[in-house]
Swiss-Prot record:
The gene is ANP1. Residues 1-15 are cytoplasmic. Signal peptide: none annotated. It is a single-pass type II membrane protein. Involved in the organization of the secretory pathway. Required to maintain a functional Golgi apparatus. The M-Pol II complex possesses alpha-1,6-mannosyltransferase activity and is probably involved in the elongation of the mannan backbone of N-linked glycans on cell wall and periplasmic proteins. This is Mannan polymerase II complex ANP1 subunit. It comes from Saccharomyces cerevisiae (strain ATCC 204508 / S288c). Keywords: Endoplasmic reticulum, Golgi apparatus, Membrane, Signal-anchor, Transmembrane, Transmembrane helix. The chain crosses the membrane at residues 16-27.
Length: 500
C-alpha cells in the first residue's frame, strides 16, 4: 500500500475565524453555566419559544390552567389580573348601600373583579338588601361598570355574640369571636378562590371612606400581603378622630414575653389593658403629612382591608381558627404568612376610615347630652318669655331721660339765682316745703314741724276728753271715780233689789 505524502496547508483566515468561533462558544458556555441557565432556557425567557401547553380542545370537560400565569402583577389592572373580592356579612343590611356606593366607584376594571359574599348568622334582611343592590349593579347600562362572576354563600357558624360595638369589642368575647370569624373566612376563601384569580381582596362592609383607587394603590407595591392604615371619625365631644384597627403591629419583646406566659390556647388581642404587649402599631405610626408610599413591615394584620396574592393562599396560608403563636384569625394569618417567608407590609400614612360605632358608655353619654339639650332649649324658651314680660311691664325711659336731663339740671345752676320750690309730698296731700313767709324749708325742719303739730293735736284731744270726763284740771282718778264716770247718766234706785 502506497501513501501519498502531501503537505497540509492551512489558510490563516480560516484559522482565525475558527478560533474566534471557538472562543465565543466557550465564553458563552462559561457565562451560561455561571448563571445556571441553558441556552434553550435563555431563548425561551426572551420569548422566542413558548412553554409547552397541552391541547385539551378535543377532550370534553377538561380545563387547563398554568398557574405561572396567575402570580399577581404589580400593574395587574393593565395585565388583566382577576381579583377575588371576599366580603363576610352578618347583620349588614344597613351598611350594604354604602358598601355598594364605594364598590361602584372603584377604578379597577369591574369586569376583572369577581365578588364573593358569605352571609352567616344574620337576623336582619341582609340577604334581601344584598340581592337588590346586586341587581342594580349588574343592570347598569354601561356594561363596563358591571362586575365579573358573583357568588353568594350562606352558612351559619353558631355566632351568638351580639353585633353592637361593646359586644364585638368586649375583652371576654375576643378569643371565641376571632376563632369563629377565622372559620368563616377560611370557608369563604376555600370555596371562592379559582385557579384564574391572581389576587384576593378582603374587605369589611362597614368602611365609611375609602379611595376609589384602593386596588391599584395597594397592588403597585407588589407585596405578598399588604394592608392600609385604618382610623375612624368620632363626635366632637370624643376628640374628632381615633385609630381604629390595632390588629396591625410589629412584634415586640414585651409581646413575646406575654405569649410565653399564657396558656397554649390563649389568644392575645390588642388594645386591652389585660394584654399589655407594647408593640408598635401601624395605626399610631400615622403622620397626616407623611408619604402614603411609605411601608412598614408587620407581623400581625387587621382584617378591615387586606390585599394578598392568590399564591399565598394556594400554598397553604390561611386564617387560623385556633391559637397560632397565641393569636387567631387575621393576626395569626400575618404571623403564619411571615413563617412561610412571605412579606407582610402595612402603609402607615395611607388611611381608610371605618364608620363610628358608639359603645354602651357612648350611648349613655349621648342620651345625657340629648336630655341636656332639651333642658337648655326649655331654659332658653322660658328666658325669652320673661324677657318679653319685662319689656312689656317696664318701660325704658332712658331716651326720655336724655331729653329731659338738660332742662332739669339747669335749675341747679347757682349763677341763675333761681328760687326752687320742690314738692316732696305725695301728690294731692296739700303740704308744701315753704313756710307761711314763703321761705324754703328743708325736709328735716318740715318733719320736726309735723311732729310738733301732731303733739299739739294729741294734747288738745286729751284736754277735750278730760273735760268730757269731768276732770278739767287733769287730776288722776281712782278706781271708784273711774267706775262712776264710766256711766255719767246712771240713775240711783229707791229700793234695794236684794231685799225681799
Amino acid at each position: 500500500m502506497k501513501y501519498n505524502n502531501r503537505k497540509l496547508s492551512f489558510n490563516p483566515t480560516t484559522v482565525s475565524i475558527a478560533g474566534t468561533l471557538l472562543t465565543v462558544f466557550f465564553l458563552t458556555r462559561l457565562v451560561l453555566s455561571f448563571f445556571s441557565i441553558s441556552l434553550f432556557q435563555l431563548v425561551t425567557f426572551q420569548g422566542i419559544f413558548k412553554p409547552y401547553v397541552p391541547d385539551f380542545k378535543n377532550t370534553p370537560s377538561v380545563e387547563f390552567y398554568d398557574l405561572r400565569n396567575y402570580q399577581g402583577n404589580k400593574d395587574g389592572w393593565q395585565q388583566g389580573d382577576r381579583i377575588l373580592f371576599c366580603v363576610p356579612l352578618r347583620d349588614a343590611s344597613e351598611h350594604l348601600p354604602m358598601f355598594f356606593n364605594h364598590l361602584n366607584t372603584m377604578t379597577y376594571p369591574h369586569n376583572l373583579i369577581d365578588l364573593s359574599f358569605l352571609v352567616s348568622d344574620s337576623s336582619d334582611n341582609t340577604m334581601g338588601v344584598l340581592l337588590s343592590n346586586l341587581q342594580m349593579a349588574q343592570s347598569q347600562q354601561d356594561k363596563s361598570k358591571r362586575f365579573g362572576n358573583i357568588e353568594i354563600y350562606e352558612k351559619d357558624f353558631g355566632q351568638i355574640i351580639g353585633q353592637s360595638f361593646s359586644d364585638r369589642h368586649g375583652f371576654g368575647a375576643q378569643g371565641p369571636r376571632r376563632k369563629l370569624m377565622a372559620r368563616a373566612r377560611n370557608w369563604l376563601g376555600s370555596v371562592a378562590l379559582k385557579p384564574y384569580h391572581s389576587w384576593v381582596y378582603w374587605r369589611d362592609v362597614d368602611v365609611e371612606t375609602i379611595p376609589t383607587t384602593i386596588m391599584e394603590d395597594l397592588m403597585h407595591h407588589d407585596k405578598d400581603v399588604i394592608v392600609p392604615n385604618v382610623w375612624r371619625p368620632l363626635p366632637d365631644w370624643l376628640g374628632n378622630i381615633q385609630p381604629y384597627d390595632l390588629n396591625s403591629w410589629k412584634e415586640s419583646e414585651g409581646g413575646l414575653q406575654l405569649a410565653d406566659s399564657l396558656d397554649e390556647d390563649a389568644v392575645i388581642v390588642e388594645g386591652y389593658p389585660e394584654y399589655a404587649t407594647w408593640r408598635p402599631h401601624l395605626a399610631y405610626m400615622r403622620d397626616p403629612n407623611g408619604n402614603p408610599e411609605d411601608e412598614m413591615e408587620l407581623d400581625g394584620i387587621g382584617g378591615v382591608s387586606i390585599l394578598a396574592k392568590a399564591k399565598v393562599f394556594r400554598t397553604g396560608s390561611h386564617f387560623p381558627a385556633f391559637s397560632f403563636e397565641k393569636h387567631a384569625e387575621t393576626e395569626a394569618f400575618g404571623r403564619l404568612s411571615r413563617r412561610m417567608n412571605y412579606n407582610v407590609i402595612g402603609l402607615p400614612h395611607y388611611v381608610i376610615w371605618h364608620i363610628y360605632e358608639p359603645s354602651s358608655d357612648d350611648l349613655k353619654h349621648m342620651a345625657w347630652m340629648a336630655e341636656e339639650e332639651k333642658r337648655k332649649l326649655e331654659e332658653e324658651r322660658i328666658r325669652e318669655f320673661y324677657n318679653k314680660i319685662w319689656e312689656i311691664g317696664f318701660e325704658d325711659v332712658r331716651d326720655q331721660w336724655n331729653e329731659e336731663r338738660d332742662s332739669i339740671l339747669k335749675n341747679i345752676d347757682s349763677t341763675l339765682n333761681n328760687k326752687v320750690t320742690v314738692d316732696w309730698s305725695e301728690e294731692g296731700d296739700g303740704s308744701e316745703l315753704v313756710d307761711s313767709k314763703g321761705d324754703f324749708v328743708s325736709p328735716n325742719n318740715q318733719q320736726q314741724q309735723q311732729q310738733q303739730q301732731q303733739q299739739q293735736q294729741q294734747q288738745q284731744q286729751q284736754q277735750q276728753q278730760q273735760q268730757l270726763d269731768g276732770n278739767p284740771q287733769g287730776k288722776p282718778l281712782d278706781d271708784n271715780d273711774k267706775n262712776k264716770k264710766k256711766h255719767p247718766k246712771e240713775v240711783p234706785l229707791d229700793f234695794d233689789p236684794d231685799r225681799n
